[in-house]
Amino acid sequence: MSLKVQWKLCWENQLERADHQELSEFFRKSYGPTGAFHAKPFEGGRSWAGARPERRAIAYDSVGIASHMGVLRRFIKVGETDLLVAELGLYAVRPDLERMGIAHSVGALTPTLRELGVPFAFGTVRHAMRNHVERYCQNGMASILTGVRVRSSIAEVNADLPSTRTEDPLVVIFPVGRPLNEWPPGTLIERNGSEL
């Protein structure tokens, strides 16, 4: 079955309050099945969980929002190397559309990534998403790094908790302006901010 979607590529400040409300509901429904904790940041019309994206790719179909991906340019540190990247995050597909191939449509972001002038895009996903991500990487458009820890700031400061968190997610890298073999070596990525 072919899925027809219309992509909207926009800067964050182009979104109106109604857009944030619609995205908030979309994220609660998309992330809620993985646990209430994952849906909580999107209460009250908020359409971001940690860092706010700079650009968004939003796919719409006849029902409403079908898919979403956020993009944020930032410097990360990979091992000893400071690296400008486009972080990809806030990825979601409406639950009724999962396994319909919409993930491959994220290629709609490619021109935007080139416009941003970054050598690589990178994102992190839970290990439970490995099969999904591996299918996407089979065509050589991306590569999965394992055994790499990622340290991020915590978006909400709490006096009783540390201000950073180190995790062991799957790291996915996408070549944009440079080939994959130029990704610097290192077993720790310093995100230098909150997760997107």
Swiss-Prot record:
The keyword Cytoplasm applies. It is found in: Cytoplasm. Signal peptide: none annotated. Keywords: Acyltransferase, Cytoplasm, Nodulation, Plasmid, Transferase. It holds the Pfam family NodA. One of its GO terms (molecular function) is acyltransferase activity. Changing E87K: In strain: 042B. GO terms for cellular component: cytosol. Its EC number is 2.3.1.-. It is an enzyme of class 2 (transferase). InterPro entries: NodA, Nodulation_prot_NodA_CS. N-acyltransferase required for nodulation. Acts in the production of a small, heat-stable compound (nod) that stimulates mitosis in various plant protoplasts. The N-acyl substituent is a C16 unsaturated or an omega-1 hydroxylated fatty acid in R.meliloti. Belongs to the NodA family. This is Nodulation protein A. The gene is nodA.
